[in-house]
Amino acid sequence: MVLEVLNPRHYNITSMVTEVAPVASIAILLLTGFLLLVWNYEDTSSIPGPGYFLGIGPLISHCRFLWMGIGSTCNYYNKTYGEFVRVWICGEETLIISKSSSMFHIMKHSHYTSRFGSKLGLQCIGMHEKGIIFNNNPALWKAVRPFFTKALSGPGLVRMVTVCADSITKHLDRLEEVRNELGYVDVLTLMRRIMLDTSNKLFLGIPLDERAIVVKIQGYFDAWQALLLKPDIFFKISWLCRKYEKSVKDLKDAMEILIEEKRQRISTAEKLEDCMDFATELIFAEKRGDLTKENVDQCILEMLIAAPDTMSVSVFFMLFLIAKHPQVEEAIMKEIQTVVGERDIRIDDMQKLKVVENFIYESMRYQPVVDLVMRKALEDDVIDGYPVKKGTNIILNIGRMHRLEFFPKPNEFTLENFARNVPYRYFQPFGFGPRACAGKYIAMVMMKVTLVTLLRSFHVQTLQGRCIEKMQKKNDLSLHPDETSDLLGMIFIPRNSDKCLDH
């Protein structure tokens, strides 16, 4: 054959192509495979997780976040690949971590104080480099955090006890407003109105329409959750963004009216000490040139939405757990009778309510609302032996960690899990370190006041067969019940005023 090919007189082009083509195809495939191997070599990682495979891996992992929600996706990847996993969001390397040692390292170091999310999404909801919750500019975040810290501690914390208790009593007296036609109480709406009323009295002090603002807060939260990880192309298609932009605008417009009224009150006040609060401090900072008007407005908005957004759902879950566990309710009621009795609750009662505190902790561990934390690495680092590059996104899967380490009965709801002191590295419902939740202390006090005040007046029941474990939930930016379900109502039974323990 070789001689025929070399000899022009015997050259047969058809025969040559037929015989050489398979060899050439194999050579091309081998060369292509080698080039792909070289191209993808830099994308290999010692960290467990799905493969890169020509960019298909990052595309699939991002789509999974958009489809399943952030929380559900994190649980999927940790369950599939382990407690330290590498995936991608918007093409950026992202770590999903549920190891306590890794979380401890990240939370305590200042080079993890930035968050991450779609820049266009955060701009749409007003959080890009503004406010405190998802402000991913460390310098601007540090500028506003002292205002939150001051408002959420000290005298504000003491005053909150009375303000919150009064708000709960007022709303319980108007319980018919949140009952449906069957007499079941819409606890989520009740708690959201109480939390908004309390936050407004403490931090803004302008009369508002609770019903309307609560609905607008829910629309804003839905937009925030939907837009946080969307790719840039999503925002170029106007009809896709329209409903979210409207939800954001509805709340911002309502808040703008309230904040403008606050500005007017400050400018006409005879004594500034009569209107000094969180909003006033921010407005003064704006007048000094320390903060922009847009940043001030966003900070006030975030302060008012924080409790209705998360704490109201936490208390909702707690009441469902109390209804299912009568022995826990009995222990709580005994402590309330011993510590508080028939008088009004006070700030100095807080440290004595240990059963209530352990119940709150166990509820937040067993059925969390905020079960993940999102951060960004600002420097190169090594975490538990794994290299982490500057700019890497990090999601701390706290909810999963709370069911993996330390607790004697991690998959059960029982106060035995807090019968002994729990090292804080194993239990982080509010985080810790430089970017810990600024409101963690006031949140604990507010939940104690809410439970004590409500349970002294009512015994709570769920509809037959309904419990947290069977409840439909959505686990995205936070974990919420599916509010399209008609199974969320509760029965409030007035207690015997003479005997706190009578049901």
From Swiss-Prot:
It is found in: Endoplasmic reticulum membrane; Microsome membrane. It catalyses: testosterone + 3 reduced [NADPH--hemoprotein reductase] + 3 O2 = 17beta-estradiol + formate + 3 oxidized [NADPH--hemoprotein reductase] + 4 H2O + 4 H(+); androst-4-ene-3,17-dione + 3 reduced [NADPH--hemoprotein reductase] + 3 O2 = estrone + formate + 3 oxidized [NADPH--hemoprotein reductase] + 4 H2O + 4 H(+); androst-4-ene-3,17-dione + reduced [NADPH--hemoprotein reductase] + O2 = 19-hydroxyandrost-4-ene-3,17-dione + oxidized [NADPH--hemoprotein reductase] + H2O + H(+); 19-hydroxyandrost-4-ene-3,17-dione + reduced [NADPH--hemoprotein reductase] + O2 = 19-oxo-androst-4-ene-3,17-dione + oxidized [NADPH--hemoprotein reductase] + 2 H2O + H(+). Keywords: Endoplasmic reticulum, Heme, Iron, Lipid metabolism, Membrane, Metal-binding, Microsome, Monooxygenase, Oxidoreductase, Transmembrane, Transmembrane helix. GO terms for cellular component: endoplasmic reticulum membrane. Pathway: Steroid hormone biosynthesis. Heme binds at C437. Its cofactor is heme. GO terms for molecular function: aromatase activity; estrogen 2-hydroxylase activity; heme binding; iron ion binding. The gene is CYP19A1. Substrate binds at D309, M374. Its main location: endoplasmic reticulum. Gene3D superfamilies: Cytochrome P450 (1.10.630.10). Belongs to the cytochrome P450 family. GO terms for biological process: female gonad development; lipid metabolic process; response to estradiol. PANTHER family: AROMATASE, CYTOCHROME P450 FAMILY 4. Its EC number is 1.14.14.14. A cytochrome P450 monooxygenase that catalyzes the conversion of C19 androgens, androst-4-ene-3,17-dione (androstenedione) and testosterone to the C18 estrogens, estrone and estradiol, respectively. Catalyzes three successive oxidations of C19 androgens: two conventional oxidations at C19 yielding 19-hydroxy and 19-oxo/19-aldehyde derivatives, followed by a third oxidative aromatization step that involves C1-beta hydrogen abstraction combined with cleavage of the C10-C19 bond to yield a phenolic A ring and formic acid. This is Aromatase. It is a multi-pass membrane protein.
